[in-house]
Amino acid sequence: MKKYTDMSLQERQAEYTAVQVEYEKLKAMGLSLNMARGKPGKAQLDLVTPIFGLLTKPEDFVSDGIDVRNYGEVAGIPAARRLFADILGCKPEQVFVGGNASLQLMYDAVSKAFTNGLLHSEKPWCKLDKVKWICPVPGYDRHFKVTESFGVEMISVPMTADGPDMDQVEALIKDPAVKGMWNVPKYSNPEGVIYSAATIDRLAKMKPAAPDFMLMWDNAYCIHEFDCDYVAFPDIISLCAKYGNADMVYEFASTSKVTFPGAGVGVMASSADNIAYFSKLINIQTIGFDKINQLRHVLFLKDKAHTLALMKQHAAILAPKFHAVLDALDKEIAPLGIAGYKRPVGGYFISVDVMPGCAKHTLALCKEAGVTMTGAGATFPYGKDPQDSNIRIAPSLPPVAELEQAIAVFCTCLKLAALEKLGV
């Protein structure tokens, strides 16, 4: 098939008529499909439901001599701190095990910077005239919502095949008002990029003008391969310490896509000094998080090796879904030259870059045909994609049969939007 840009006006008009007919057929099916967020599917949830059968007798609730049914240490039970240190490659004293969401810990970390300041802050950030933040784009919408909620000025930096454009990052951190940077370093959301060793090294050795700069390291997909073997990843905490930046990095992870979204365990890892400081502050707002759930996860996941074996089972469910989307894009979109897309081997998303000015229109057409997707612009600060071109696809929730229907709708809508943009 010809690329749309190589077609004559008459050829594009004929193609447009044919695609419109297909679109009307899809609309008539009365679909109601959702690919808006990276939610695990039912088969994945069924996989981990046995976790609820592990605590049945009174003695089951005792770990390291601690009865988790009672009050306890705010930073988490020792067994949970050991487990997540094993998974992340750091030390137990560098781990804070919280409640059901790493996002809550990210929000709390930024919040404490504003209300109390960090270890190396001259004053709480709420007393500063301006706070700026580096945001690699496309990126994670919920990260951007956190900093936006504090009135932070977000500065977009483009992603490359190796991670964020480090030349731009290194120029920006010379400004003392630049206080932090979001990162999803492994299988980035939404592109699935793995930061290169060189990029990670440059980030770890940065010398920001702000002494309390926060390198926010959301390692959400640290063990989330679906199309390859586990990829080992550097321990950013020890690397930062090596370059004299022990207190600069704040790493986050959770079991949201290992066990249950919204009912798993969220983790923050940082220097032991940072963990002690945050434990003191967080202990004012809570006596402690759900230790029973922490122990439940320790007993179910056991250690890194056992957790990776579980992730292989998740991968067997996820891989066919990603393949269904990529196969459809390869067949229906790639030959037409109207979009580019990444081929991730881990994470939870596929990033598609359509022709400038076509993302919103494509997704509006999808919605009209009964398919809900992540909103256009969500992958940029303030929800504003300057090119109106990036679309995030989340294949994980629907069964493959429904997913094939949804991606057929998407491809058809993308064709219509591209043809209208080119002129018919």
How does the language model describe each region?
Residues 2-75, 79-80, 85-86, 368-371:
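N-terminal "arm"/small-domain region of PLP-dependent enzymes with the aminotransferase-like
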Residues 98, 238-319, 332, 419:
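Conserved core segment of the aminotransferase class I/II
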Residues 362-368, 406-411:
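Short amphipathic alpha-helices in soluble, non-transmembrane regions
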Residues 351-356, 373-415:
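Conserved PLP-binding active-site segment of the aspartate aminotransferase-like
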Residues 60, 66-211, 222-244, 359, ...:
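Conserved core of the PLP fold type I
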Residues 312-326, 338-353:
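Conserved glycine-rich beta-strand-loop-beta hairpin in the small C-terminal domain of fold type I
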Residues 38-42, 102-103, 139-141, 162, ...:
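Short, solvent-exposed loop/turn segments at secondary-structure junctions
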